[in-house]
Amino acid sequence: MRMVDIIEKKRDGKSLSKEEIEFFIKGYTNGDIPDYQASSLAMAIFFQDMNDEERAALTMAMVNSGDVIDLSKINGIKVDKHSTGGVGDTTTLVLAPLVAAVGVPVAKMSGRGLGHTGGTIDKLESIKGFHVEISEEDFIKLVNENQVAVIGQSGNLTPADKKLYALRDVTGTVNSIPLIASSIMSKKIAAGADAIVLDVKTGNGAFMKTLEDAEALAHAMVSIGNNVGRNTMAIISDMSQPLGRAIGNALELKEAIDTLNGKGPEDLTELVLTLGSQMVVLANRANTLEEARQLLNEAIENGSALEKFKTFLENQGGDVSVVDAPELLPTATYQIEYKAQSSGVVSELIANEIGVASMMLGAGRQTKEDEIDLSVGIVLNKKVGDVVKEGESLLTIHSNRENVDDVIKKLDESIEIQAQATTPTLIHKIITE
């Protein structure tokens, strides 16, 4: 088999066989196939697309390029949730203990975040003593005993994906549906999930800006999952404004605790219940979505979700007292109110830009080496569709420096007030095939 023949075949719009895709991934991962041939094939895929079989074959070739986590010793159906990322996306922190409280095993492997705020692990590490450096054996034991545990990403998972992603980044082939879908799904499958719930974001704060693109990506990932024996479904949710009200690590953790207490923001609560219901059904803990939602609501109302969160923190060395006293979480020195310059209705809160503003305060990382300030961030006091009076506080800036003129300038560009505006749709579509 020759790489040049594979490139020409895809260039001419023909389908590649499973063997050809495996030959490419294996050869590229071990260094036999040079970057220039790999980037040529990536560009051919970018223009000619791939069918469902090719996408599934590419995904599994990347899964098999490295270690695969074996979670078979964990009882029950392991359902993993993946979000394509957004601003103020606190869902994992609420979802994990909530679905665990109704018996769904959550074996979560999480990374550190690059971008607007930290990843799930960074947020949890704003709790004193909490750690994710646990052995695989302890991880499995904790999930069997308490239904939920989080471990840091370790081992050599999907090395082919890491190598191909770095190449796509510099060759103009990032925005290709088959390449994005196989990249995301290979990581989830290698991490041992039996079933997968995807939260595909759309809007200005998302990777997929239009509903059409988000739908295409969701269909691609669901089809890959179902083709390789992993029950998969996707929800397309809105990210034109930040989710919830908090953007920042400790601030989002506090919001997660409020939500588990039944006092969270409406949109975050709704998204968590929608995603959670799907997870409960996929794990066979309920027959219908209505029944699943009822179980989740009960777990919030009777306090079992919050109890589950406490046990989870305790199991991993975290100081549980913060759950009852969130003021013990890292707190910024200055709280600065950002006030409305006119009266009207909030018509735009550009998620992306607000994320950048929060990063300027130190809430996120630009490079892997950056230190995150866990205490800083932004809390929205108004959301799109809310009425506001001139001089009223739109949001609160939590900062460890007194001068935040640069952040205010950024916020000026990301907020609009008009005579009228409507609240955006939160959940656009649910995709099961």
Swiss-Prot record:
Pfam families: Glycos_trans_3N, Glycos_transf_3, PYNP_C
Coiled-coil zones: none
Protein role: Catalyzes phosphorolysis of the pyrimidine nucleosides uridine, thymidine and 2'-deoxyuridine with the formation of the corresponding pyrimidine base and ribose-1-phosphate.
EC number of the protein: 2.4.2.2
Sites where the protein binds K(+): G88, T90, L243, A246, E255
Family: Belongs to the thymidine/pyrimidine-nucleoside phosphorylase family.
GO biological process terms held by the UniProt record: pyrimidine nucleobase metabolic process; pyrimidine nucleoside metabolic process
KW Glycosyltransferase (keyword) present: yes
Cofactor notes: Binds 1 K(+) ion per subunit.
Binding positions for phosphate per the UniProt entry: K81, H82, S83, T92, K108, M109, S110, T120
Residues reported in the UniProt entry to bind substrate: R168, K187
Official protein name in the record: Pyrimidine-nucleoside phosphorylase
GO cellular component, one term: cytosol
Catalytic activities: uridine + phosphate = alpha-D-ribose 1-phosphate + uracil; thymidine + phosphate = 2-deoxy-alpha-D-ribose 1-phosphate + thymine; 2'-deoxyuridine + phosphate = 2-deoxy-alpha-D-ribose 1-phosphate + uracil
Organism annotation: Staphylococcus haemolyticus (strain JCSC1435)
